[in-house]
């Protein structure tokens, strides 16, 4: 048989809040990073979205979006590498590990507080039955 229940104890202290609560944005100078991949077969172009887990307070300016091709040196705005992506405050940096032959980065498109979109296209000398394949990492830092 079960014994008599004891009195309820006192409630402990509430722990500290998490870093981000729903509705909050990425704090100033904080950085988010991620990985990306794009792949298709026999398409002339393909779009890739880059979603930021924690939204920014404002969308990245189009002049602050950068694409660093495999083998290119880092820049002042994007001092990182594909293995260690970095972005200076207010910058969005995409690092490509590989762009297969017949594929080029075209442009960044629509910008939102929660991400941006990029387009990749096949080059004129892409062989029949080609595939567009690329992958790498990205970083965004809030202003």
Q: What annotation goes with each model-predicted range?
A:
Residues 7-143:
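Extracellular receptor-binding modules and their adjoining Ser/Thr/Gly/Asp/Asn-rich linkers
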Residues 1-4:
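Short, low-complexity N-terminal tether/leader segments at secretion or assembly junctions of large
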